[in-house]
Design a protein with these regions (language model features):
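Short coil-to-beta-strand transition motifs
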Residues: 47-52, 96-99
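Short structured motifs
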Residues: 53-58, 101
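Amphipathic alpha-helical interaction segments
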Residues: 12-13, 54, 85, 121
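A mature extracytoplasmic/lumenal domain signature
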Residues: 24-27, 35, 52, 73-77, ...
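Exposed beta-sheet edge and beta->alpha loop/turn motif
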Residues: 62-124
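Core segments of small alpha/beta cavity-forming domains
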Residues: 1-50
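Short, mixed-charge, low-aromatic patches
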Residues: 29, 58-63
Length: 124
């Protein structure tokens, strides 16, 4: 997970998501976020602060029936600020931490652990 977090934060800082894409599948929320970041930077925008840290809250668990792995994680973040090239600003603050803990679902493919989905405990 540490390699992905480094690639994730590098993407946010630079707009170069090529490394982060290796760790997610195209149908994930994370993939859509990276496409947004790429377009933001390509059009002259940028991100301020906005970096994440993830803390493992469980061991990696293999679900034999679904043939996928899952791990409970906590996203640690404070603020996100995205500045569009036209001057528009999107600000988010982590004022409600009740949704910071969830599960990443993984597969192992082509030498990488790939995030294939994220779900809250009640969605598993």
């Amino acid at each position: 997970m540490e390699d992905w977090v480094n690639a994730h934060n590098y993407a946010i800082q630079t707009g170069d998501c090529s490394y982060a894409f290796k760790y997610v599948t195209e149908d994930t929320e994370e993939y859509g976020f990276y496409k947004y970041i790429e377009i933001l930077y390509k059009n002259g925008g940028w991100a301020v602060d906005s970096l994440d840290s993830y803390q493992s809250e469980s061991a990696l668990f293999y679900d034999e029936s679904k043939k996928i792995y899952r791990m409970k994680v906590r996203r640690i973040w404070s603020t996100e600020i995205y500045i569009e090239s036209n001057g528009g600003i999107t600000r988010k603050a982590n004022t409600d931490t009740s949704d910071d803990t969830f599960y990443f679902l993984y597969t192992y493919s082509n030498g990488y652990w790939k995030i294939i989905d994220s779900k809250y405990e009640n969605e598993l």
